[in-house]
Amino acid sequence: MTRFILIFGYHVAMLKLLVICLSAALVASAAELPTRKYLNLAAIKTMVAAAESEAQKRNVQVTICIMDESGNLLFLQKADGATLNTIQFAQKKAKYAALYGRPSKVAEDSLKSGNLGVLVFPDGFPNQGGLPIKVDDKIIGGIACSGAASEVDEAISQVAINALLK
């Protein structure tokens, strides 16, 4: 009987140890799940308000476009007085910035230096004005403005990003 109790006690102790180890492993696994930053509605509204304010200061009518990191449309607004072509231009610039993680001006500069390969990139758009939105060096989206001079479009986009990150 004593032998049975010793063996039974040993097995119970081992079972408890196994449960503790598995529990610790599950907690460790859950703790290691990555957290992902993304553009929620509040972030988008902050960026749009800053872009609208900057465009108004500069007395320009622009279309503002914000995409998520996969190039999906999150926000699009054409100001009164902005031409219709700015809708597509803003979308293409924002998508390029989001997908490739660099300003759309990079594609423009590459094309100007003779690299025609830029023209065959899917969703490539060689025109300044689109910027990637990065938080902690991770791309969470892209923003672009279109309707003013290209450098002004980019400056307005940068003001919007700065408003988000402050």
Predicted segment positions?
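A general lysine-centric signal
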Residues: 15-16, 93
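Sec-dependent N-terminal signal peptides
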Residues: 17-25
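Sec/Tat signal peptide C-region and signal peptidase I cleavage site
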Residues: 26-30
